[in-house]
Amino acid sequence: EWLTDYGNLRSNGYIPVGSTGHTAGAPGNPFFQNFVMCQNGLDAALAGTDLEVGLYIPGLADWAGMISVGGYAYGNSRYDWSAGPQAGEDIVPWFGGVYTRLDMTFIQNWDFSLQANNDSYFDWTGFARLTYRMGGSRRRNVPDQVEQPMMRNEHIVRAHQTPIVALNHDNGNQPWRVIHVNNTATPVGNGTAEAPFTNIVAANAAATNPYDIVVVAQGNSRVNLDPASSAYGDISNPYGGTFTPLAANQYFIGQGAAFFIPTSTCGPIDIGGLAGPRPVLSNPTGASINLAGGLVTSNFDIVNSAIGIGSAGNLSAPGPGGRPSVATDIDIYRTDPAARTQGIVINNASGEAIFRDVNIGKQVTLPDGTVENWTMTDGSIVVNGGAPVIDFADGTILNTQENILEVANTLGGEVILTANPGQPFLETGDGVLVSNAAGDVTVKNAVPGSPSMIIDSQQDGIRVVNSSGTQTFDDVVIVAAGGPGFAGVNLQNNPGTSNFNNLDITTVNSIGFLAANDN
């Protein structure tokens, strides 16, 4: 500090010691521990320096008036963000700013200061300060100034941001609870964002509360699912096991595409939209996902599973108006020729399940130019028993073996398949089978007049047997049936009602439309 009777030149250095930074979460990353964050938290002491020059103003001499101008540079490079798009960067990058201050003494012992700062980190800040000093406070001469304390930028040498946790309005405004899975995590953790579980089974066991969210990272589950890979389709590190919700209204979400949850704190938050393809699930002995209790699941590839998506009891959450189970943005397919697979299997269920943007089977071109159908071996959609309501729309089905749709032994409910315009369900297996069904079945296109299903069947195109429900097939094209003894449409012993609108049948060596003992 250099003092004169006309003004001064002053510089400060800021050297914090000890623990100088604490964070809760990270910018651009919604997760911290088991919480979803609306805003990450930060407390950081800043190192740096400032420099100012001050001059007494002649017109304010009676009040010892001084105008000071200065600049500063601060930052905290001791700690880095550990996650999110700024991972590896300083928690407070170095920044510079400028300021100006007016100092005056109105009456003996009372000092007044007014300061304004501007910088790229805090934007505009400042303070107004009134100070009572024992023993007088006139400051025009050097001896008086020596007795005055140094002026410092205390108000901006600590960076602070209060963490805000996302709350769930539907769960009494309790914080959302998230359990994390990443099969590349080392060591094996306890399910926090910083220490994930490495497998689905452990995460499933930990998700015991209503509205719990299990979030699955891609990890290394997509090995050999790059179309350019010479071993394309030979998956080696998928997530195994079955996820079955242990409480109502849970979530099972893969990362790689946007998925928003509602919060009462800060509106919708995306918990799935980190960059990269979706994680891969595979269970050769059972279902990869069981729908129950209003489960919401999204953003997965299910490959070579005995059952892609299954069920476990009531599909809806308990109570009147309980939330249905919902599956969105899921691809189910088979890459292993030896695997026995089914797409969606709903057994003896009640309640409702909604499927949106779920694709079953697909056609791929291998690196050598070979075209393969990665489809199910034992049918695409099977509904057996119970009285569920199944609503499938905005997805695609490519079926080459067994039935594209089988509904059997239902006691009520309804199965609705709605195709998108220009994306009819494609069947070259064993057609549609409805047997002993008291529930209704509807196949249609979202835009009437566009084909909903194109059937090139090895057996009957559509077979309905011993069923008392109402079956409605709109805009179905049957280009072939299985030959002698088979029919494009075969109705046998049905006390219910079968409706066909805009049905187009072309067959060779088989019957077009056959009805026997039918209502």
Regions found by a protein language model. Name each.
Residues 38, 79-86, 186-188, 223-241, ...:
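Surface-exposed intrinsically disordered loops and tails
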Residues 225-227, 263-264, 285-289, 304-311, ...:
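Short glycine/acidic-rich loop motifs that flank beta-strands on beta-rich extracellular proteins
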Residues 217, 253-255, 292, 303, ...:
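Feature marks extracellular polysaccharide-active and adherence modules
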Residues 251-305, 336, 424-425, 445, ...:
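Right-handed parallel beta-helix/beta-spiral solenoid domain characteristic of secreted/periplasmic
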Residues 163-206, 210, 218-222:
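Right-handed parallel beta-helix/beta-solenoid
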Residues 178, 211-213, 220, 242-243, ...:
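Detector for repetitive beta-architecture
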Residues 211-265, 284-285, 305:
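N-terminal extracellular ligand-recognition/capping segment immediately after the signal peptide
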Residues 17-68, 74-84, 88-90, 105-113, ...:
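Flexible, glycine-rich linker and terminal segments associated
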